[in-house]
C-alpha cells in the first residue's frame, strides 16, 4: 500500500488492541492500525456475535461524519452550527466493493478520501448502498457512475423522485452479495435501512442515522429530526442485539456494549 500508514483493516487482534489502550475514540484513524495481541481480561474475552466464515474480507471507514448540531455538546436542536457530513464506509469481499452512504458532494474530495483510506478510485467501486433519503447520505453518489446504486424499495423510490440523480437507484431487499444483510431500522425515517455483516468473527452494523452518534446511542435518543423517537429507541435496542461493532451515521465506529 502506498504511503507509510496502513489502511484501516478489520483485523480483530488489531481492533481489540487499540480498544484496550483507549484509542478507539480518536478521529485521526477510523480503523485499527497494528499492535500485539490483547492481554487477558481485555475486550478479547467478549463473546462475539459474528461468524468467522464470511465473504466480507475487510471494511474501511472513508469519512467520519459529524452532525449539524449536537445537543450533547450543549448545542441547540433548533439551530445548525456546521454542515453535516455522514460517516461513509466501504465493504470489500469476494466479487464486490460496496460503498455505503457516499457523503462528499465534491468529486475531488470524495476521490481523495477514498484513495486515502483504501487505495481505490471511484471506478473501482462496484455498488453503492444508501441507508435513507436524506441528502447528506447520498450527495456523493453521482461520483460512482459505474457502480450499481442500491437502496431499500421505499428509499429507492424517494431518491428516484428527487430527479437529482443521473440514473435510477435499484430496489434491494434482504441481502446483497450473499453476506450483506439489509435490515429495517425505522425511527429516524420510517423507511430507514441499515446493513449488517460479519468480518473476522465480529458482527458489524452500518447503522446510518438510526444511530446518529455514540452519545445518542448511549441515551437511546433519536436525532432532532427523527420522525418517531419511541421507534428509534426500539431500533437501537435491536441493533444492540445484533452488533459487536456499530458504525453510526455521524461519528466514528464503537464497540457494543459501549463502556
Each model region followed by its residue ranges:
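A mid-sequence, solvent-exposed acidic-amphipathic segment
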Residues: 169-191
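Active-site neighborhood of phospho(di)ester-bond hydrolases with catalytic His/Asp-centered motifs
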Residues: 100-103, 126-134, 150-152, 184-187, ...
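Beta-strand-turn-beta hairpins that frame and shape the catalytic cleft
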Residues: 54-59, 92-97, 174-181, 199-203
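Soluble or luminal CAZymes and related metallo-dependent hydrolases
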Residues: 83, 106-109, 187, 227-235
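Active-site HxH/HxHxD metal-binding segment of metal-dependent hydrolases
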Residues: 79, 83-84, 97, 102-175
Amino acid at each position: 500500500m502506498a504511503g507509510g500508514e496502513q489502511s484501516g483493516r478489520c483485523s480483530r487482534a488489531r481492533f481489540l488492541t487499540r480498544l484496550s489502550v483507549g484509542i478507539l475514540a480518536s478521529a485521526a484513524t477510523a480503523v485499527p492500525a497494528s499492535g500485539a495481541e490483547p492481554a487477558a481480561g481485555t475486550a478479547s474475552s467478549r463473546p462475539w456475535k459474528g461468524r468467522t466464515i464470511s465473504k466480507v474480507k475487510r471494511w474501511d471507514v472513508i469519512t467520519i461524519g459529524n452532525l449539524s448540531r449536537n445537543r450533547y455538546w450543549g448545542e441547540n436542536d433548533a439551530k445548525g452550527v456546521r454542515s453535516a457530513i455522514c460517516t461513509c464506509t466501504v465493504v470489500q469481499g469476494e466479487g464486490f466493493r460496496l460503498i455505503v452512504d457516499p457523503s462528499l458532494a465534491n468529486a475531488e474530495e470524495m476521490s481523495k478520501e477514498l484513495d486515502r483510506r483504501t487505495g481505490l478510485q471511484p471506478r473501482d467501486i462496484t455498488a453503492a448502498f444508501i441507508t435513507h433519503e436524506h441528502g447528506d447520505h447520498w450527495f456523493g453518489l453521482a461520483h460512482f457512475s459505474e457502480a450499481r446504486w442500491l437502496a431499500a424499495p421505499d428509499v429507492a423510490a424517494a431518491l428516484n423522485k428527487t430527479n437529482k440523480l443521473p440514473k435510477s437507484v435499484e430496489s434491494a431487499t434482504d441481502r446483497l452479495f450473499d453476506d450483506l444483510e439489509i435490515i429495517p431500522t425505522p425511527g429516524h425515517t420510517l423507511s430507514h435501512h441499515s446493513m449488517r455483516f460479519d468480518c473476522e468473527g465480529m458482527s458489524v452494523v452500518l447503522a446510518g442515522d438510526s444511530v446518529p452518534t455514540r452519545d445518542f446511542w448511549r441515551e437511546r435518543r433519536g436525532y432532532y429530526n427523527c420522525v418517531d423517537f419511541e421507534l428509534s429507541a426500539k431500533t437501537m435496542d435491536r441493533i444492540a442485539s445484533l452488533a459487536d461493532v456499530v458504525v453510526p451515521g455521524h461519528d466514528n465506529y464503537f464497540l457494543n456494549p459501549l463502556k
